[in-house]
Design a protein with these regions (language model features):
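Alpha-helical, coiled-coil/dimerization segments enriched in small aliphatic residues
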Residues: 240-271
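A short, structured surface patch at a secondary-structure boundary
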Residues: 67-129, 133-134, 138-142, 262
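Short helix-initiation/N-cap motifs at beta->coil->alpha
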Residues: 49-51, 112-122, 266-276
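Bacterial Sec-exported substrate-binding components of ABC uptake systems
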Residues: 2-14, 18-76, 192-230, 283, ...
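Structured C-terminal subdomain patch of bacterial secreted/periplasmic proteins
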Residues: 177-186, 266, 278, 282, ...
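Short helices/loops that flank or line small-molecule/ion binding pockets
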Residues: 120-133, 148, 152, 273-283
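Extracytoplasmic ligand-binding site segments that recognize negatively charged/polar headgroups
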Residues: 94-97, 140-149, 159-189, 221-249, ...
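Stable alpha-helical elements in mature extracytoplasmic
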Residues: 69-73, 122, 146, 150, ...
Length: 349
């Protein structure tokens, strides 16, 4: 249960940054090198990440993806069509809202690595992979006191390193308010690093277009209360309500879908435990349950609804199941559309 909780905490957010010398990408998500419109990266490209500068003289060919309780980074690599660069991947979610993605992730090489107690890649195993790029969900993935190879050790071995911008702290704590723009920044930056900036631009444009179309359908409609639940994921608690979404990228997703999270927090709190008494007096129009390796997630959703017959969501049996699209990654548009159809079905008939 502790490992499940750690997975959810790390999945909460991620983005990244880049600045530089020849071709450069800055901390501003909208700033891209001119080469992005040409569909290729002009090397060398220098990137500022978590206060340090990394220079790529060519596209990475031996990429290692650390676990960190995330799936957004490896999903972005798959979406960008550069999965063949991965020599060892430790990320896996077991389900996806995008057809064939979970299977594509499972098919990536793992490097035959025995993970440590944190279910991630220990120092010696990492160095033995001879990577030229290591991607970690947070700064903690390079913490020596956790048994990981440091960014300095990897640089000495010839590997650049990359951490999403908001997660540079050792604990991986999220800074600022995560939004879908963070997912676009991740795609844009990985596209630049891996010589597919044009492909990144197309993915971003497709997502923006899909979200705009969905948002237009629900524009002017009353905002509906959406409860986002991670069943059984609480710290040492198997309750359905011990891990309810508070602050996170998902609030931007819900907003663009014409909904609102009644338990939204802007103080950095990602999950909250809500009592049944409080839930009973909170009007809920749509229930979203997040599936992480559940044997019967539909039964879980129906069990939750049955406890609150007064909810509009219960009266209409109104729930949706999501997996990876609610987190940072390349497919937030999928979550936006599914939640919009959940709480504003009349706008999609």
């Amino acid at each position: 249960m502790l490992m499940k909780r750690a997975l959810l905490l790390a999945l909460a957010a991620s983005t990244l940054a880049v600045t530089g010398c020849t071709t450069s990408v800055t901390d501003a998500a909208d700033n891209r090198p001119s080469s992005a419109t040409e569909g290729v990266t002009k090397y060398p490209v220098s990137l500022e990440n978590c206060g340090k500068t990394y220079t790529f003289t060519e596209t990475p060919k031996r990429v290692v993806v650390m676990n960190g309780g995330s799936v957004g980074e490896v999903s972005s690599l798959i979406a960008l069509g550069v999965g063949d660069r991965v020599v060892a991947n430790a990320q896996s979610y077991g389900a996806s809202d995008v057809p064939d993605r979970a299977a594509a992730i499972d098919a990536l090489p793992t490097g035959n690595i025995t993970p440590n107690s944190l279910q991630d890649i220990p120092r010696e195993a990492m160095l033995n992979q001879r990577p030229d790029l290591v991607i970690s969900t947070g700064g903690g993935g390079f913490a020596a006191d956790q048994g990981f190879a440091t960014r300095e050790e990897l640089a000495a071995a010839g590997a650049n390193t990359y951490v999403p911008r908001a997660n540079c702290g050792v604990t991986g704590a999220v800074t600022g308010t995560p939004t879908i723009e963070d997912s676009y920044a991740l795609l844009r930056d990985l596209g630049t690093i891996l010589d597919v900036p044009g492909r990144a631009d197309r993915l971003i444009a497709d997502s923006q277009r899909a979200i705009a179309e969905t948002a237009a359908r629900v524009a002017g409609q009353p905002k509906k209360n959406v409860l986002l639940v991670f069943p059984g994921m609480g710290m040492g608690d198997s309750s359905d309500f011990s891990a309810i979404a508070a602050g996170g990228l998902w609030n931007d997703v819900i907003d663009k879908a014409g909904g609102v999270n009644p338990f939204n927090r802007d103080d950095g709190t990602t999950f909250v435990t809500i009592s049944k008494e409080q839930l009973a007096v909170t009007p809920i129009d749509g229930l979203v349950v997040v599936n992480y390796r559940s044997p019967d997630i539909d039964a879980v959703a129906k069990r939750i609804l049955a406890q609150f017959p007064q909810w509009n969501a219960t009266k209409t049996n109104n729930y949706a199941v999501l997996a990876d699209s609610i987190y940072l990654g390349p497919s937030n548009d999928v979550a936006v559309q599914r939640i919009a159809k959940l709480v504003h079905p009349e706008q999609f008939r």
